[in-house]
Amino acid sequence: MTAYLIANYDVVDRDLYRSYQKQSMPIMAGGAKLLVLDHASVGKEGTPGAQTVVIEYPTKEAALAVYESDEYQAVIGIRLSAISNGRGMIVDGFVMPS
């Protein structure tokens, strides 16, 4: 079943975040499809950050494999230092029953 990595946060250090993007994009490329990269998300409930990212993976296992890989774990600290008010999750897609 298709799965999605959904992240929402505020970028507090653009230069550091660009460094993270440059290093993380090749890691996430294998089987992933970037669906959303919005720098001006409009929050309607709660206190969401301004940036939202949605990445599609073929399965939840594939998404977890990328997130938990040594390569991604080596750069995740850069993202965490560049953002605040962050949250992220990996969720299964939904198939409407027929």
Which sequence ranges carry the predicted segments?
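Short S/T/G/P-rich N-terminal loop/turn motif that feeds into the first structured element of a domain
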Residues: 1-52, 57-68, 92-98
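C-terminal structural segments of small proteins and small subunits
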Residues: 64-66, 71-91
